[in-house]
């Protein structure tokens, strides 16, 4: 039995879970998310707990068991608390500013780089070098934050670029001088 998959999921007050065949919908204070459960996995609801079960011990069923349980738990946490990734920009002249719901980055290129917010994602600019990406879908928040970081990855020699808050950059030693 999957150690993660066998744990029951408690549904907090104010969250409505709807099972419709293989589609599970979670509705909460922050919004609504839905997910299609893969075929061998079954989800059952008893009052305020959800249980994820698998019919057999095939490799595919075992791997989907823990995954499905975690995805449903992430959906419930997303509609109650939401998710947030903080990013910081390091480098002379590197900055970010909000243009409506979009962001405009100056990252040392010859042109400003614009990033528009996908549906369900909000950007909060906390200063010229700090921003946060927030939303209810954990995967989408992580993907948008990773795409922003990809615009200018941290340089291993000077550490300049876009990084996650608290991320430690492995530094390299430059070439030896005379």
UniProtKB/Swiss-Prot annotation:
GO terms for cellular component: cytosolic large ribosomal subunit. InterPro entries: Ribosomal_uL6-like (IPR000702), Ribosomal_uL6-like_a/b-dom_sf (IPR036789), Ribosomal_uL6_a/b-dom (IPR020040), Ribosomal_uL6_bac-type (IPR019906), Ribosomal_uL6_CS (IPR002358). It comes from the Bacteria. GO terms for biological process: cytoplasmic translation. Keywords: Ribonucleoprotein, Ribosomal protein, RNA-binding, rRNA-binding. PROSITE patterns: RIBOSOMAL_L6_1. GO terms for molecular function: rRNA binding; structural constituent of ribosome. Signal peptide: none annotated. Part of the 50S ribosomal subunit. This protein binds to the 23S rRNA, and is important in its secondary structure. It is located near the subunit interface in the base of the L7/L12 stalk, and near the tRNA binding site of the peptidyltransferase center. HAMAP family: Ribosomal_uL6_B (MF_01365_B). Belongs to the universal ribosomal protein uL6 family. This is Large ribosomal subunit protein uL6. It comes from Paenarthrobacter aurescens (strain TC1).
